UniProtKB/Swiss-Prot annotation:
HAMAP family: RecA. InterPro entries: AAA+_ATPase, DNA_recomb/repair_RecA, DNA_recomb/repair_RecA_CS, P-loop_NTPase, RecA-like_C, RecA-like_N, RecA_ATP-bd, RecA_C_sf. The keyword Lipid metabolism does not apply. It is found in: Cytoplasm. GO terms for cellular component: cytosol. This is Protein RecA. The keyword DNA damage applies. One of its GO terms (biological process) is DNA repair.
Amino acid sequence: MAPQAHDRDKALDLALAQIDKNFGKGSVMRLGEGVRQPIAVIPTGSISLDVALGIGGLPRGRVVEIYGPESSGKTTVALHAVANAQAAGGIAAFIDAEHALDPDYAQKLGVDTDALLVSQPDTGEQALEIADMLIRSGALDILVVDSVAALVPRAEIEGEMGDSHVGLQARLMSQALRKMTGALSNSGTTAIFINQLREKIGVMFGSPETTTGGKALKFYSSVRLDVRRIETLKDGTDAVGNRTRVKVVKNKVAPPFKQAEFDILYGQGISKEGSLIDMGVEHGFIRKSGSWYTYEGDQLGQGKENARKFLLENTDIRDEIEKKIKEKLGIGADVTAAATDDAAPVEF
């Protein structure tokens, strides 16, 4: 005979009391208890990408994977997130497994290179152990691993060139992510894993592209970003940057599959002003007539490049446009200011 509702409630209360006693108060809670807080985020540096992510940036306390072809802008996006975290008073770490970090370029993107924690590990085990220890310190706001493909297991480094090491890297990533995810949530650290693309042999239907490091990173990531270069930006005959498209292929904190486009300028990174012009035109704050851009009767310039330079020089107008866009779309500092470490986000 099934137990009565009263008996079930009493049994549940006893079990919850015992769990709280053994593991601490709040180990189990009802999702509807208390006020739900917004998810704390780190802005990406592109307002269009912040909008595509649905919450105004990369979620704190989660795993994020950024992947794409070579020279598509993966590290640039990650470094902009680092710069924004530091600008808000946060501490950032960069695990440079590729041994290819350019401090001068990072500085141009706004990264405080003097305060940035950098490690250039010898093996994949060393890289992930360092990352885990930094996360468990509870002091870190953002951690970047560049890249997963360069996390070479110790056995492969110490072995001969022709030796087979099937599945070693995948097992290493799986074990590391099992350990890290809980610590990330507790510390509120955002872990960004930059990944490369490979092609599967013999695929007849569907995309042959796949990422390195096995399937664990796909499962543990709350956000996965596919970064592609779609166009070369030119000033006359000189190439000055790339038009970049980012697709949010996985998103556990907002609806997925949204896309964002923005400009990455050589030596400057993501053009914040270019993103504001694109979003301003899309949402009616900036008027485009022919090749002219106007804002509330004021001419910003003829052509996007001139309008971008105008906003670069007139930061008050730029900030005003940014504020209006964020208010309309419900993203930004005002919305995420109330976010706390114990926020309970809804997962999609």
